[in-house]
Regions:
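TOPRIM metal-binding catalytic domain and adjacent DNA-binding surface shared by DnaG-type primases
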Residues: 1-16, 20-23, 57-58, 97, ...
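Phosphate-handling DNA/RNA-contact segment within nucleic-acid enzymes
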Residues: 6-102
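Acidic beta-strand-to-loop metal/phosphate-binding motif
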Residues: 65, 100-114, 132-133
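Short, acidic/turn-prone active-site loops that include or flank metal/cofactor-
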Residues: 82-90, 108-111, 134-136
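Short, aromatic/basic amphipathic alpha-helical patches
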Residues: 114-126
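A generic structural motif
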Residues: 128-139
Length: 170
């Protein structure tokens, strides 16, 4: 992940995590405070429509969609959305549709409705979608890798048939 931190300058007091495109070029980075400063994140003033961590994604394996970079570190072959939404116009969405027929969703429990909207979108493209429970934790990043893997193994397959039931159970 090539994680670093800044002691001085515009990003002082922040952990910096770079993202590299498939050619190995720096495409973006996030800078998160490790103090109790506000704002929590201070990111570069460039377009963030990138596939974060693209260089290290194995597109031959299922990918895991998570909200943040620290979640992705725990999850493994994961794409951080840098939020809790996914647009059809985004590079992440386009790569998933082109390359990855199976997706695991693991957004924070407080984003359940947004997660179901993403699942609905992915199902419209005939992808196989599993929902990983994050209940009992703030997010994937607060789990151990072992706990996340256990939850991933027990993930619920969401299809057109049970999608509505899942929405009603929120």
């Amino acid at each position: 992940w090539r994680i670093g931190f800044c002691r001085t300058g515009a990003y002082a007091g922040r952990v910096c995590i770079p993202s590299f495109d498939e050619g190995g070029n720096l495409s973006y980075f996030i800078a998160r405070t490790y103090k109790n400063d506000f704002p929590k994140y201070k990111n570069p003033p460039v377009d963030r429509n990138v596939v974060f961590n693209e260089l290290y994604i194995d597109w031959q394996e299922p990918v895991i969609l998570v909200e943040g970079v620290f979640d992705a570190i725990v999850a493994g072959n994961a794409l951080p959305l840098l939020g809790s939404t996914l647009s059809e116009r985004s590079q992440v969405f386009k790569r998933i549709i082109e390359e990855c027929p199976t997706v695991y969703m693991a957004l924070d429990a407080d984003a359940a409705k947004k997660e179901m909207r993403i699942i609905k979108l992915l199902l419209q493209y005939d992808l196989k979608v599993y929902k990983v429970s994050t209940s009992g934790y703030d997010d994937v990043g607060s789990m151990t890798k072992g706990e996340f893997l256990k939850r991933k193994e027990g993930a619920a397959l969401i299809d057109q048939t049970n999608y509505l039931y899942q929405c009603l159970s929120l």
